[in-house]
Amino acid sequence: MRRVVFNQKGGVGKSSIACNLAAVSAAQGYRTLLIDLDAQANSSHYLSGLTGDALPTGMADYFKQVLTGGAAGKKARPPIHETPFENLHLITATAELADLQPKLEAKHKINKLRKLLDNLAEDYERIYLDTPPALNFFTVSALIAADRCLIPFDCDSFSRQALYSLLDEIEELQEDHNEGLTVEGIVVNQFQPRAALPLQMVNELLAEGLPVLPVHLMSSVRMRESHQVCMPLIHFDPRHKLTQQFVELHGYLES
């Protein structure tokens, strides 16, 4: 299973959702890998506790090998790092990814990530791909490489406006590059059940026939606190309601 967590809008919780679902997967015994493709490296920091120059090499190292071409490029494999959490491994992002993007685009390396995931298939049962908040080279590579796509969504008008174009972009990519990509659904994040607007917006999306998932992720300060200590919720506060929502969401997606 290769799941990409994607939304071209920033601030909707892509990294939090990718990392926490990956952590639940690993806690349930699946050999799990998270690949961070965002130069901001939020997922890398969350799962390793490291930032900036302290982050070990990862996807940037891999793509530099790819750009060399020849035998070295064909055998390229990124450094894979253990995390403090059993069964959960990480390929980090660093700021260097942003500098590599135009070179990778110029050399048409858009399918290299899919080949890498093919080579990792025997090592990992579950692979999660965290993407940048833009439809750029790394995001398209992830959508081509994945077989499932999860779309985080905040209940506000800006997110809703962006959602329609996002779904159109995914459909076009499916037709052109990856017919095997399945949109699993829209996961509502930062949900406030007592507020009228979020529930109204969810109902309107459902009425339009959009695939809104039945498990919503509540807004909670515990998420920000888990970021602060670099510990996914399943390890930081396993009994918290938001943690249990992640467990429920993971179970729904696995069913």
Map each language-model feature to its residues.
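P-loop NTP-binding core
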Residues: 1-255
